[in-house]
Design a protein with these regions (language model features):
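Active-site gating loops and adjacent loop-to-helix segments of metal-dependent hydrolytic enzymes
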Residues: 1-10, 54
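Phosphate-interacting basic helix/loop segments used at nucleotide- and nucleic-acid interfaces
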Residues: 18-29
Length: 132
């Protein structure tokens, strides 16, 4: 409040809103046909490396995301198990001016013109790209 008194608490903050461990989350995601994709591993807070102190060998992730593409060589050197994985660079922007310039992109196939849902088609294509 205006006097800096606590007026309530939030028990399920987004960063800890699950009781699944890493293996269970990976298995569940895979079971539903998704890709478990560690995000912004190079961020100093909440990235898998900051939380665990390492990029684990298991579960076997097919891809990962960097917040800053300039950190790629450093992370490959520190964690050789990242070397042959797909990766994307994403700014994790929450403001328009923080969006990257488009120099990092993923090429996906053109959606068919047969009435297929474009968003469903692109979602599936992106999952396949990250999986392989």
């Amino acid at each position: 409040d205006a006097d800096d008194n606590i007026i309530s608490t939030e028990p399920d903050l987004l960063i800890n809103a699950t009781d699944l461990d890493l293996y269970a989350a990976h298995a569940l995601c895979t079971e539903y046909g998704g890709v478990c994709h560690p995000a912004h591993i190079d961020r100093q807070s909440n990235g898998i490396v900051a939380v665990l102190g390492d990029f684990p060998e298991e579960p076997r992730f097919s891809s990962f995301e960097l917040n800053d593409g300039a950190s790629f060589d450093e992370y490959i050197r520190r964690f050789p198990n990242l070397k042959n994985k797909n990766f994307v660079v994403c700014s994790d922007a929450h403001r328009l001016e923080a969006l990257s310039d488009g120099s990092n992109s993923i090429s996906l196939p053109e959606p068919p013109e047969d009435g297929t849902s474009v968003s469903a088609f692109l979602r599936k294509a992106l999952i396949e790209k990250l999986r392989n």
